[in-house]
Regions:
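Bacterial N-terminal signal peptides
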Residues: 7-16
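Cyclophilin-like peptidyl-prolyl cis-trans isomerases
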Residues: 20-300
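Positively charged n-region of N-terminal signal peptides that target proteins for export
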Residues: 1-4
């Protein structure tokens, strides 16, 4: 099927990249927003377009505000995903406070809420990754800054190794190799670090709004696929007067089968997702951004 126009997508990305300001400051006043067109009926999603989440790469986070679920991406950041799994299996994150909650992100991950790191060694930064043909990448289209698309639920930007915008590759030819980086959209999960980019250890944060100024600076390891409303509901503060906390953090594969959330995610390679994407682009017009796209999840 023909690819949707990326003119609007590029405009949104160019504006965000040029601003380089905290995400909360980028939201225009409601009075300046253009009128929203009437929403079209969502396309019917056939059963075969849904796929079960991978229990080995799904993190279930219970908090004082409720539960959210994160799709982890070892193909983007293998060391950081391995660290999350190891600390979750140790019970390290259980009881960790959301001690720094700002408009754009919620930070947690300090077991003692005072030591700022686990006993494990710091990790080298994995803010960029190598796209290979083995990684199932869905291209939305070429931008002057790279090729935008999805790896599962994770929005990414690819600098093609060959072809692509820099060398005149047509927009409908998706790259299969090159350097990639995660886009810090709402729901992106990443590791915090100190002055050195190679000092990530146990501190993690979850994006509440878009944060382009964080891209390629911090290692993203996953994206919230269910429960982003929980992340948004966490009490603000640095620290909050009465912080929320993670009560229990588990890799889904480690949970008893009866206790696991029964979730299916829409396959981004499916025609159903392509139809949803085109509908979103048509509805938003020049205001469209890849961060507007929420990957549908089916429970039960």
């Amino acid at each position: 099927m023909p690819k949707p126009s990326l003119i609007a997508l590029f405009a949104a990305f160019a504006t965000a990249a040029a601003a380089q300001a905290p995400p909360a400051a980028q939201v225009p006043p409601a009075a300046q927003a253009p009128p929203t067109p009437e929403a079209a009926a969502p396309p019917v999603i056939p059963d075969e377009a849904w796929k079960p989440v991978d229990p080995a790469n799904t993190l279930v986070v219970d908090t004082t505000k409720g539960r959210f679920v994160v799709e982890m991406h070892p193909e983007l950041a293998p060391r950081h995903v391995a660290r999350i799994k190891a600390l979750a299996r140790q019970g390290y994150y259980n009881g960790s406070l959301f001690y720094r909650v700002l408009d754009f992100m919620a930070q947690t991950g300090d077991k003692g809420n005072k030591q700022y790191r686990s006993s494990l060694p710091n990790m080298k930064n994995e803010a960029t990754f190598r796209l290979t043909p083995a990684i199932p990448y869905l291209s939305i289209g070429a931008l002057p800054t790279g090729d935008a698309g999805f790896i599962g639920a994770m929005p990414v930007l690819i600098q093609p190794a060959q072809g692509g915008p820099a060398s005149g590759q047509p927009a409908d030819q998706a790259p299969t190799s090159g350097e990639g980086s995660a886009l810090f959209c709402p729901g992106t999960a990443a590791f915090a670090h100190g002055p050195s980019i190679d000092s990530a250890n146990s501190q993690i944060f979850f994006m509440r709004v878009r944060g382009p100024n964080l891209e390629k600076q911090f290692t993203a390891w996953g994206r919230v696929i269910q429960g982003q409303d929980v992340v948004k509901a966490l009490k603000n503060g640095e620290p909050p007067p009465s912080p929320d906390k993670m009560t229990r953090v588990r890799v889904m594969a480690d949970m008893p089968a009866a206790d696991r959330p029964r979730l299916k995610v829409l396959d981004v390679k499916s025609p159903a997702f392509a139809a949803l994407l085109q509908q979103e682009i048509a509805a938003k017009g020049a205001r469209f951004s890849i961060c507007d796209v929420e990957i549908p999840v089916q429970a039960g």
